[in-house]
Curated annotation (Swiss-Prot):
It comes from Mus musculus (Mouse). Residues 204-242 form the LRRCT domain. Residues 335-357 have a biased composition (Basic and acidic residues). This is Protein phosphatase 1 regulatory subunit 42. It comes from the Eukaryota. The keyword DNA repair does not apply.
Length: 357
């Protein structure tokens, strides 16, 4: 196995020391070191490389990140395809902008607190135990919320990326070959990531859902590329018009439904059986006069109720007759006596005699 030391760096660098120039002075000039694919398994003290800004250590056998505390000017660190299982000892790299950790054994994204300048984080294709997925430490996500612009989490068996909504300045998300299933979850995420303009989700089950692309384009106005394909203005405008037409039809349908419901409710109330109390009004106008001759005609022709006895019929006839006689007598005037039998009345005779005299 090989350990990365300053001597190894000096031997493999293209530096040509000047006369009377020390090793420390030479190492201080180094800004880029490339020791990729050299079977390196550990990192020695690199404090003499104070101006180191880019370090390539990918495709090695490094299992632990150490001795980078004094490389405070480091901006790019390439550690992909090593044997790293834990992200640690990076808090002093205040100027770090790009960190590549893909192809390792990392199960949790953590230990990045304090990296306020980190813009790109690549943690794709971690070699995880079967059935496990890559997780995110909330503290790390909070610390990267304002700085991170590019995140690569591809091929990590991830089925939920809701936690990423805190990354308010994220503009490029790469999450291909995961287990994302639901379009609704992606819509909610896109509503939060207002600056996201490029997203790659190829290889996820969600890509096979109906209207997947259309729904995401309609949700995010900032998105310009989806799954490697550009979103053109004409495509977005067409989808917006289609959605507006669809929404208008829904609103119209709801209004018609409400109107029909109201009409049916009115008819239903109208048809409801109510108990109506009858109101009787007194008869107004001239009363009908029943003459004795009419009653006789009624009885002769048998129109009276069969239930009435002969005795009842006689009584009724007599009562009506008496009533008619009384009314006739009271209405007589001195000149109006047409019935001979009334002359037998003494008072009537007296009145007639006085009139003649």
């Amino acid at each position: 196995m090989v350990r990365l030391t300053v001597d190894l760096i000096a031997k493999n660098s293209n530096l040509k020391p000047r006369k009377e120039e020390t090793l420390a002075q030479c190492l201080k000039k180094i800004t880029h070191i490339n020791f990729s694919d050299r079977n390196i398994d550990s990192i020695d003290d690199l404090s003499l490389c104070r101006n180191l800004s880019v370090l390539y250590l990918y495709d090695n056998r490094i299992s632990q990140v150490t001795n980078l505390n004094y490389t405070t000017n480091l901006t790019h660190l390439y550690l992909q395809n090593n044997c790293i299982s834990c992200i640690e000892n990076l808090s002093s790299l205040k100027k770090l902008e790009k960190l590549y950790l893909g192809g390792n054994y990392i199960a949790v994204i953590e230990g990045l607190e304090g990296l306020e300048e980190l813009r790109e984080l690549h943690v794709e294709s971690q070699r995880l135990p079967l059935g496990e997925k890559l997780l995110f430490d909330p503290r790390t996500l909070r610390s990267l919320a304002k700085s991170l612009s590019t995140l690569n989490i591809s091929n990590n068996n991830i089925d939920d990326i809701k936690d990423l909504e805190i990354l308010e300045n994220l503009n490029h998300l790469i999450a291909v070959d995961n287990q994302l299933m639901h379009v609704k979850d992606l819509e909610l995420l896109l509503k939060k990531l207002m600056k996201l303009w490029k997203m790659d989700l190829n290889g996820n089950p969600v890509c096979l859902k109906p209207k997947y692309r259309d729904k995401l384009i309609l949700t995010s106005k900032s998105l310009e590329f989806l799954d490697g394909k550009e979103i053109k203005d004409m495509e977005r405008q067409f989808l917006m018009n289609w959605k507006a037409s669809k929404d208008a039809k829904k609103i119209s349908k709801k209004r018609r439904s409400r109107s029909e419901d109201a009409s049916n409710s009115y008819i239903s109330n109208f048809e409801t059986v109510h108990h109506i109390v009858p109101v009787y009004y007194p008869q107004v106008g001239k009363p009908k006069v029943i003459f004795f001759s009419d009653v006789q005609r009624y009885l002769v022709h048998g129109n009276a109720s069969s239930k009435c006895s002969q005795e009842d019929k006689t009584t009724i006839t007599e009562d009506i007759g008496n009533l008619s006689l009384k009314e006739s007598e009271s209405s007589l005037t001195k000149n109006d006596i047409h019935e001979p039998h009334l002359l037998q009345n003494p008072k009537v005779k007296e009145n007639l005699s006085e009139k003649k005299e």
